[in-house]
UniProtKB/Swiss-Prot annotation:
Region entry PBC-B, spans: 127-237
Biased composition (Low complexity): 318-335
Pfam families listed in its UniProt record: Homeobox_KN (PF05920), PBC (PF03792)
Name this polypeptide is given: Homeobox protein extradenticle
Job of this protein: Transcription factor which acts with the selector homeodomain proteins altering the regulation of downstream target genes such as wingless (wg), teashirt (tsh) and decapentaplegic (dpp), thus affecting segmental identity. Delimits the eye field and prevent inappropriate eye development. Required for proper localization of chordotonal organs within the peripheral nervous system.
Database matches in Gene3D superfamilies: Homeodomain-like
Organism of this sequence: Drosophila melanogaster (Fruit fly)
Region described as Disordered: 1-37, 318-376
Length: 376
């Protein structure tokens, strides 16, 4: 019978390989897990380095670039990137098509050129002002040429101010666009030393940048066009308002009209005198009296109040705008001829003297009591 200690030792010797085999599997699993941990750690370090790029100083970034460019594996890295690019560039090659110009931007450009804001300054503002003045006058003569000249110069001055602001803002826009484009192009050229970037891709990126900036340019041109249209509308409205007679001219014409209600048809000599005093033409005087007679007949009540007002003014004192009144006789209802008068200046009725009244020169030949019962 053998010694148990020898058998134990022998058994231990036999069991040893089995125990060694199990520990080998455990060591392989541990080595694989260690590799995974190491890979994750490396990825984490790479991500940390990428995140720290934005915090690096310019000197540190230049040092890292120099280290990368001098690395012995840099050509291999560039070759791999070129292979990847050849595979991916085929899918995006067909998407790079030329886009037509924006029609809205073209319309804005044409409008700014027509208004004399864009393009070379060749009197475009003056031409626009002249056309606006002609459209506002509508074929009628201006009442005050000096005022029209002043307004015309104001329009051109404001249009020149709009033009100046537009060109200043456009210059700022173009400067910002050029600076940003130059920065991106330099950045892409710098990156082309590490990754493959073709000149066509750089040109494509420039086009994308200009398209982004075109929205700012469109807003600038749109606001400028709106400012020009507002200026034109205000100028045209002002021109239309100037077609009305001045207060002095209205006073002269109304005073003559109500002083001659018996025969509100001024002679050619009177029209010329009125036109001279009012600073208007004879045809405008004729048109005014024609319109005044129609308005008086349609609204006799309101016209009667206005007639009383002018009669009171004349009773208080002679107006500086007044002309010579009628030679004699009292007024009669509107649109009726004056009745015949005798040698004493009294109206003659069919049956002789009709309510003989002395002639009141203070009223200018007009008695408001005779027109209280007039019907339209």
């Amino acid at each position: 019978m053998e010694d148990p200690n020898r058998m134990l030792a022998h058994t231990g010797g036999m069991m040893a390989p089995q125990g060694y085999g199990l520990s080998g599997q455990d060591d392989g699993q541990n080595a694989g897990s260690e590799n995974e941990v190491r890979k994750q750690k490396d990825i984490g370090e790479i991500l940390q380095q990428i995140m720290s790029i934005s915090e690096q100083s310019l000197d540190e970034a230049q040092a890292r670039k120099h280290t990368l460019n001098c690395h012995r594996m840099k050509p291999a890295l560039f070759s791999v990137l070129c292979e990847i690019k050849e595979k991916t560039v085929l899918s995006i090659r067909n998407t790079q098509e030329e886009e037509p110009p924006d029609p809205q931007l073209m319309r804005l450009d044409n409008m700014l050129i027509a208004e004399g804001v864009a393009g070379p300054e060749k009197g475009g503002g003056g031409a626009a002002a002249a056309s606006a003045a002609a459209a506002s006058q509508g074929g009628s003569l201006s009442i005050d040429g000096a005022d029209n000249a002043i307004e015309h110069s104001d329009y051109r001055a404001k249009l020149a101010q709009i033009r100046q602001i537009y060109h200043q803002e456009l210059e700022k826009y173009e400067q910002a666009c050029n600076e940003f484009t130059t920065h991106v192009m330099n950045l892409l050229r710098e990156q082309s030393r590490t990754r493959p970037i073709t000149p066509k891709e750089i040109e494509r990126m420039v086009q994308i940048i200009h398209k982004k900036f075109s929205s700012i340019q469109m807003q600038l041109k749109q606001s400028t066009c709106e400012a020009v249209m507002i200026l034109r509308s205000r100028f045209l409205d002002a021109r239309r308002k100037r077609r009305n007679f001045s207060k002095q001219a209205s006073e002269i014409l109304n005073e003559y009209f109500y002083s001659h209600l018996s025969n509100p048809y001024p002679s050619e000599e009177a029209k010329e005198e009125l036109a001279r005093k009012c600073g208007i033409t004879v045809s405008q005087v004729s048109n005014w009296f024609g319109n005044k007679r129609i308005r008086y007949k349609k609204n006799i009540g309101k016209a009667q109040e206005e007639a009383n007002l002018y009669a009171a003014k004349k009773a208080a004192g002679a107006s500086p705008y007044s002309m010579a009144g009628p030679p004699s006789g009292t007024t009669t209802p509107m649109m009726s001829p004056a009745p015949p008068q005798d040698s004493m200046g009294y109206p003659m009725g069919s049956g002789g003297y009709d309510q003989q009244q002395p002639y009141d020169n203070s009223m200018g030949g007009y008695d408001p009591n005779l027109h209280q019962d007039l019907s339209p």
